From Swiss-Prot:
Residues 57-67 have a biased composition (Basic and acidic residues). This is Vang-like protein 2. Changing F437S: In NTD; the mutation protein completely abrogates interaction with DVL1 compared to wild-type. One of its GO terms (biological process) is wound healing. Belongs to the Vang family. Residues 69-81 have a biased composition (Low complexity).
Length: 521
């Protein structure tokens, strides 16, 4: 009873102190407002719209809007510029996209083009220099020599087309390091051409070789060597990576979306480029709004306890025992956060199904209206609407259902009104069904399906403990990082399978069925 009387006394005092504190706050605020009107000092007013500045927090604090942070008005006396989190994200993305001019990539392309031009013009120079320098001393070229001209011409044409198809393709990415195999091939071609030029200068130019057929055969041998180098390039750059040797597991660090891929012998940086190509059309679009837990779970407060010692005698022992009892009681209380999360998820799924049903019905009615208009136009020809006008005409009937569904599924940042109209116009133009129109919105599509401004990152960072020019090995882990998330790639070598053969004699499957007079068949 003493404890209850003390508790009620504390409650009365606390309530009285709250009421007196409110009156004192009103009086102080009125005085400060009158002083601020005369001085013109800085002032900050934060007020939720639709509610008075002073409300009973003890009774209405839990009934406020969950989105109060989005509707709060902030007025400052010194602010001339404002910035939001979206602005900061946009600025960071602009800084990420503003990649400086990559001189190394253009230098590599220029070196490759120069070397290709040198190797292509060298056989022609071998054929043209002797007639230009010592035409009178050359022996006449016979039929076999003239036939070699045709061989050189077609081989050079094949070499030109093959080099264009293999080397002069639009680059998919800018690699952080040199492509080792391609650099080795370029060095090999350079050494081959320089060796032929040295031999040509010493044995043909200095000696003034009179046999023009020997000069032509020397040029043909150079073209043949270049063709073999091109064949080697095809094997090293294209065929070597086709045989699967490793299994890659790619996991997105934020939501855990994962995929498995099989690749051949590639360097780490080339595997990174290949993974990014697969990522944009295999992984669903990254939606950070789906990562947050429900607000009811996040806002749950853990109850705390304060232990006060009211007596003077044996205060230490009493307080220690009481605190232990309270802590033990708190430990025995079960945390019901998982139950709240379960019911929140069930409620969200029910809401999504409801919004989806309304959206499907609205789209079906809109497309039915389009078909009815088309049938009426065939019977009574009049002014025909183009697909854009038809899309704008029926969009109003489905706009509200579409907006609510996108908000419920948190897809509204990825679908603007203009993009929905363009997709609707596309479906009307190609006479597509309502299900074909809704396919883009009912499920999250691949990343490349959405507008580039929403997902495209021009710069990724490759993080690896191994040099990126090394080939893949079993157990290698590397990361592909961008501003919002990263892709974690782990490598496993394809196991070696040993198969054994077991011969089964066909006669072992045969059997004899003996029938007796009592046997019924």
């Amino acid at each position: 009873m003493d404890t209850e009387s003390q508790y009620s006394g504390y409650s009365y005092k606390s309530g009285h102190s709250r009421s007196s504190r409110k009156h004192r706050d009103r009086r102080d605020r009125h005085r400060s407002k009158s002083r601020d009107g005369g001085r013109g000092d800085k002032s900050v007013t934060i007020q939720a719209p639709g509610e008075p500045l002073l409300d009973n927090e003890s009774t209405r604090g839990d009934e406020r809007d969950d989105n109060w942070g989005e509707t709060t008005t902030v007025v400052t006396g010194t602010s001339e510029h404002s910035i939001s989190h979206d602005d900061l994200t946009r600025i960071a993305k602009d800084m990420e996209d503003s990649v400086p001019l990559d001189c190394s990539r253009h230098l590599g392309v220029a070196a490759g083009a120069t070397l290709a031009l040198l190797s292509f013009l060298t056989p022609l120079a071998f054929l043209l220099l002797p007639p230009l320098l010592w035409r009178e001393e050359l022996e006449p070229c016979g039929t076999a020599c003239e036939g070699l001209f045709i061989s050189v011409a077609f081989k050079l044409l094949i070499l030109l087309l093959g080099s264009w198809a293999l080397f002069f393709r639009r680059p998919k990415a800018s690699l952080p390091r040199v492509f080792v195999l391609r650099a080795l091939l370029m060095v090999l071609v350079f050494l081959l051409v320089v060796s032929y030029w040295l031999f040509y200068g010493v044995r043909i130019l200095d000696a003034r070789e009179r046999s023009y057929q020997g000069v032509v055969q020397f040029a043909v041998s150079l073209v043949d060597a270049l063709l073999f180098v091109h064949y080697l390039a095809v094997v090293l750059l294209e065929l070597r990576q086709l045989q699967p040797q490793f299994t890659l597991k790619v996991v997105r660090s934020t939501d855990g979306a994962s995929r498995f891929y099989n690749v051949g012998h590639l360097s780490i940086q080339r595997v990174a480029v290949w993974i990014l190509e697969k990522y944009y059309h295999d992984f669903p679009v990254y939606n950070p709004a789906l990562l947050n837990l429900p607000k009811s779970v996040l806002a749950k407060k853990v109850s705390g306890f304060k232990v006060y010692s009211l007596g003077e005698e044996n205060s230490t022992n009493n307080s220690t025992g009481q605190s232990r009892a309270v802590i033990a009681a708190a430990a025995r209380r079960r945390d019901n956060s998982h139950n709240e999360y379960y019911y929140e998820e069930a409620e969200h799924e029910r809401r999504v199904r409801k919004r989806r049903a309304r959206l499907v019905v609205a789209v079906e009615e809109a497309f039915t209206h389009i078909k009815r208009l088309q049938e009426e136009e065939q019977k009574n020809p009049r002014e025909v609407m183009d697909p854009r006008e038809a899309a704008q005409a029926i969009f109003a009937s489905m706009a509200r259902a579409m907006q609510k569904y996108l908000r419920t599924t948190k897809q509204q940042p990825y679908h603007t009104m203009e993009s929905i109209l363009q997709h609707l116009e596309f479906c009307i133009t190609h006479d597509m069904t309502p299900k074909a129109f809704l396919e883009r919105y009912l499920a999250a599509g691949p990343t490349i399906q959405y507008h580039k401004e929403r997902w495209l990152a021009k710069q990724w960072t490759l993080v690896s403990e191994e040099p990126v020019t090394n080939g893949l090995k079993d157990g290698i882990v590397f990361l592909l990082k961008r501003q919002d998330f990263s892709l974690v790639v782990s490598t496993k070598k394809v196991p070696f399978f040993k198969l054994s053969e077991e011969f089964v004699d066909p006669k072992s499957h045969k059997f004899v069925m003996r029938l007796q007079s009592e046997t019924s068949v």
